Amino acid sequence: MADWSAAQYLKFEDERTRPARDLVAQVPVDFPRRVVDIGCGPGNSTELLVQRWPDAQVSGFDTSPDMIEKARVRLPNVSFDLADASTWQPAEPVNVIFANAVFQWLPTHPAVFQRLMGFLAPGGALAVQMPDNLLEPSHQMMRDTAAEMPFADKLKGAARGPLPPVSFYYDLMSPLADRLDIWHTAYNHPLADAEAIVEWVKSTGLKPFLDPLDADERKMFLDSYTAKIAKAYPKTADGKVLLRFPRIFIVAKRAG
């Protein structure tokens, strides 16, 4: 895929940061020495880590040069690097490994979770949040639109696979954790209109569908997709639309 756009991502910064804030609040580590933000993006989640643990050595990494550039401007005293979660390895044990809305993009993330647990210091925690919204109209319409387009062959394989059920993550992580907490939260975001929903997903879920297309194809796709979204998300009494956004949270603490 083309590089991620920090500016597009930050159009809905408050809404995107709220799940990270909810995840940070549930990490059962009071005085960590080293905290790492995997897939730190433009630094909005990293900022929460610095606020909760001001005395910790907080760092972050991402695969996107644009995201890292913005994160360094936002938090000049934090170390940010380009790295891939699937191959990253810390130089020494870490007390908190934090990953907000990253691992849904990595099909091999269950194996990566197991690796990351091995990088924790005793009493450390792995904290993960992933969108679990592939059955929502916002994402169903992406797949429907892709299948209808005359250039559908270009979009084969664009859709990411669904996440495993909660029981899978429990069975995967419980042998590795002294304490394991898994839960779902469905956020209901009031947005201006259907176009706002499209703007939201442009920087994330819609990106794999748009990147392979030329300008004319992209316009054709977006016109069709936006029309479907307008039908799927009717206006509320105040004229806005509600974007329902389910997410799964996993916090696994290693024995101390």
Swiss-Prot record:
GO biological process: methylation
EC number(s) given by UniProt: 2.1.1.144
Any GO MF annotation of the entry: trans-aconitate 2-methyltransferase activity
Tree of life domain: Bacteria
Enzyme class: transferase
GO CC terms in record: cytoplasm
Reaction(s) the record says it catalyses: trans-aconitate + S-adenosyl-L-methionine = (E)-3-(methoxycarbonyl)pent-2-enedioate + S-adenosyl-L-homocysteine
Compartments where found: Cytoplasm
Keyword line: Cytoplasm, Methyltransferase, S-adenosyl-L-methionine, Transferase
InterPro entries in the record: SAM-dependent_MTases_sf, Trans-aconitate_MeTrfase, Trans_acon_MeTrfase_C
Pfam family, one: Methyltransf_23
Matching Gene3D superfamilies: S-adenosyl-L-methionine-dependent methyltransferases (1.10.150.290), Vaccinia Virus protein VP39 (3.40.50.150)
Main subcellular localisation: cytoplasm
Family under the similarity heading: Belongs to the methyltransferase superfamily. Tam family.
Primary role: Catalyzes the S-adenosylmethionine monomethyl esterification of trans-aconitate.
HAMAP family: Tran_acon_Me_trans
Protein name in UniProt: Trans-aconitate 2-methyltransferase
